[in-house]
């Protein structure tokens, strides 16, 4: 899972990011991850 987070962060707001959110199926995690990318 950690590797997927790093990969999604590297891709940014690309398609892999959306796949990452659907993969976890966790609203809280998805929202948190999205905010982290916007701040970064």
Swiss-Prot record:
Q: What is this protein called?
A: Unknown protein from spot 237 of 2D-PAGE of etiolated coleoptile
Composition bias type Basic and acidic residues, residue spans: 25-40
Which residue intervals are annotated with compositional bias (Low complexity) in the record?
1-11
Please list where the region (Disordered) is annotated. 1-40
Q: Of which family is this protein a member?
A: To tomato abscisic stress ripening proteins.
Misc. comment: On the 2D-gel the determined pI of this unknown protein is: 6.0, its MW is: 21.7 kDa.
